[in-house]
Structure formats: C-alpha cells, structure tokens
C-alpha cells in the first residue's frame, strides 16, 4: 500500500542505521477496510505486491533505475549489498508459492508443516536457490503477567479484537 520509492528510502535508512541487521517482511494485505482507506482495489493486491518487490529490488542496487517511467536513485545505497533480506509474510500454499516466484523468502503465519514443502517445491521448479522459509512452531501471541486476571481486564478486549479481526 506504500509508495515503493518512499518505502525504499525509509528501508535504506533503517538498513544503514542497523548496519545491515534488518529484514523486510512484505504482505499483500487482506482486510478490505484497509484498501478502502487507501483508495485501492483489493483485487489488485497481488499485482501491486509484484510491482513493489520488483521496484524495491531495483532501488536497492544504489544505481540509477527506471521505476514507472521515472529515472531514480535511492541514496545512500543500502548497507547490505542489494538491500536487506526480503520475505513475503502469509499463510497457505498460494502465498508460499508466490514468495518463491518473487525470488524472496517466506515467513509463514501459521504452523502448517506443508508450507515449507510448497515453498521449496516452487523454488525447485523455478531453479531459485536463494530463498528460505520460516514456519513457526508455536502460537504467535504470548502475554506474560504476574497477575493474569488483572491484565486480562486491561488487554482482553484488544487481544480478542485482534484475534477475531485478523
């Protein structure tokens, strides 16, 4: 949903500050209301993601490149040669295979053991050897408290909203 040139500039600054210790996880988006807020078509999300990944890869070279008919160069160049590592975040077979086709890693949102197989299978079909997949083994939300009853009164409705709406 973000302009890829502005995003590249912001990521390069973070990459410089972190001296190469950052990773970028991208997503297509999946909530209609977020697309409505940005005046974007939900049906265009895969095409937009593919465009943005291609643009970021070009912009991370530190060279002059053409993006949407504009000749641009992001400076300074990223600390990491070629820019920080990029991954697609998502769940399911379609997302895992898309990450391989984009030539980036895949950060799975759930622990389905088939995800790594789908990603690795698509990488093999494409001859892509530079990627990897991360599949979580545990739940993604953990809250540690010395008084769970008290804290649930404070965070409960927010945690439930997050779980039910995402």
Please tell me what each predicted stretch does.
Residues 1-166:
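Active-site-adjacent structural elements that line small-molecule/cofactor binding pockets in enzymes
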């Amino acid at each position: 949903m973000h302009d890829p040139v502005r995003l590249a500039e912001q990521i390069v600054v973070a990459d410089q500050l972190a001296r190469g210790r950052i990773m970028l996880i991208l997503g297509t988006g999946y909530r209609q209301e977020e697309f409505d807020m940005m005046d974007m078509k939900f049906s265009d999300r895969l095409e937009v993601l593919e465009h943005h990944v291609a643009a970021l890869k070009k912009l991370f070279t530190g060279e002059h490149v053409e993006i949407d008919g504009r000749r641009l160069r992001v400076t300074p160049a990223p600390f990491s040669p070629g820019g920080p590592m990029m991954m697609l975040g998502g769940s399911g077979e379609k997302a895992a295979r898309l990450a391989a086709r984009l030539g980036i890693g895949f950060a799975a949102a759930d622990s389905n053991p088939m995800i790594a197989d789908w990603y690795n299978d698509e990488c093999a079909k494409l001859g892509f050897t530079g990627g990897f997949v991360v599949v979580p083994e545990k739940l993604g939300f953990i809250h540690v408290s010395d008084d769970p009853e008290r804290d649930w009164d404070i965070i409960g409705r927010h945690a439930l909203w997050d779980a039910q709406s995402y």
